Swiss-Prot record:
InterPro entries: Amidohydro-rel, DHOdimr, Dihydroorotase_CS, Metal_Hydrolase. One of its GO terms (cellular component) is cytosol. The active site is at D247. The keyword DNA repair does not apply. The keyword Metal-binding applies. It comes from Rhizobium leguminosarum bv. trifolii (strain WSM2304). Keywords: Hydrolase, Metal-binding, Pyrimidine biosynthesis, Zinc. Its cofactor is Zn(2+). Zn(2+) 1 binds at H13, H15, K99, D247. This is Dihydroorotase.
Length: 346
């Protein structure tokens, strides 16, 4: 197959940042993707509908002329979040989901939830009105190994929450383990998972073998090869409970290349090329559209995009920049460590 035409994709987990960084990265998303769930972990975080309204306006202002893109806003869940404010934002159409960050789990998550009981009034209201909860599924207790955080989160936090509130709609974001995949598959209702393009490509060797490679470090951290293969199988299966969420997370290079580097991989610019490569390897190009363009909208109660894009396979590798330049500084682009021959042509 030399070309494939699919409905315009969406990104169900995206970091756009703010200010000069937002202005420098947004075109890489809006050029290809029609919609994206926007992460709220700014400094300070997006915790109220008023915050979300202002952030959405900044995003739309940063869009290049002629780009059609809809930011789907989220709120950062805290122990003091107002159920009434969440419901008002959801009913207005502004808020698509609320994001749960266990405190300390990832970038700018220190204001997240430490005591789930204090967040229950909001979660109960969300369950009542059908508003999804997006979760960063990792525990942060120091005695838990970083490679086990997702599995322990499922057992100690997520499963008890879902048993208590079975009507709450939950998205496990950036699933990285076979444990997460199996847990989603076993659920009868109200559970789905997003998968990144980079977790389909790298395992933890990419970070550690031959020297520490900070531009492959993200949270949740890449896992063993058996987990990567489980993610691939889920992504290409056509199962409607799995969909693309890039978790594209730009950091300027000095914040990655240092003694205590930030977690995050910047993938927006080459995500679709990487995915076409992966799905071709798995003999599943006919299911790429489901993963990128159909399953996510169905889960979030939206219509799929009417616009189409075409990916073409060319003989010579596609050349992506090693870095992009923003007003905040240079950002290194994800390198899948093999040539990419698929690219978006229309």
């Amino acid at each position: 197959m030399q070309s494939i035409t699919i409905r315009r994709p969406d990104d169900w987990h995206l970091h756009l940042r703010d200010g000069a960084m937002l202005e420098g990265v947004i075109a890489d998303t809006s050029r290809t993707f029609a919609r994206a769930i926007i992460m709220p972990n700014l400094v300070p975080p997006v915790v109220t509908t008023s915050d979300a309204t202002a952030y959405r306006e900044r995003i739309l202002k940063a869009l290049p002329a002629g780009h059609r893109f809809q930011p789907l806003m989220t709120l950062y869940l805290t122990e003091h979040t107002s159920p009434d404010d969440v419901e008002a934002g959801a009913r207005s159409g502004l808020i698509t989901a609320v994001k749960l960050y266990p405190a300390g789990a990832t970038t700018n998550s220190h204001g997240g939830v430490r005591d789930m009981e204090k967040a229950m009034p909001v979660l109960e209201r969300m369950a009542a009105i059908g508003l999804p909860l997006c979760v960063h599924g990792e525990v942060t207790t120091p005695e838990v190994d970083i490679f086990d955080r997702e599995a322990v989160f499922i057992d100690t936090v997520l499963d008890p929450l879902r048993r208590r509130l079975p009507e709450l709609k939950v998205t496990m974001e950036h699933v990285t383990t076979s444990d997460g995949i199996d847990y989603i598959k076993a659920a009868k209702a109200n559970l789905a998972g997003s998968i990144t393009s980079h977790h389909l490509i790298i395992n933890r060797n990419a970070i550690l073998v031959g020297g520490i490679r900070p531009h492959y470090y993200c949270l949740p951290v890449a896992k063993r090869e058996n987990h990567r293969l489980a993610l691939r199988a889920a992504a290409v299966s056509g199962d409607a409970r799995f969909f693309l969420g890039t978790d594209s997370a730009p950091h300027v290079d000095p914040l990655k290349e240092c003694a205590c580097g930030c977690a995050g991989i910047y993938t927006s610019i080459n995500t679709m090329s990487c995915l076409a490569h992966v799905f071709e390897e798995e003999d599943a190009l006919d299911r790429l559209e489901a993963f990128t363009s159909l399953n996510g909208p169905a889960w979030y109660g939206l219509q799929p995009n009417e616009e189409r894009i075409t990916l073409s396979r060319q003989a010579e590798p596609v050349v992506f920049p090693a870095k992009i330049e923003t007003g905040a500084g240079s950002v290194t682009v994800f390198d899948p460590m093999y040539p990419l021959h698929w690219h978006v042509v229309a």
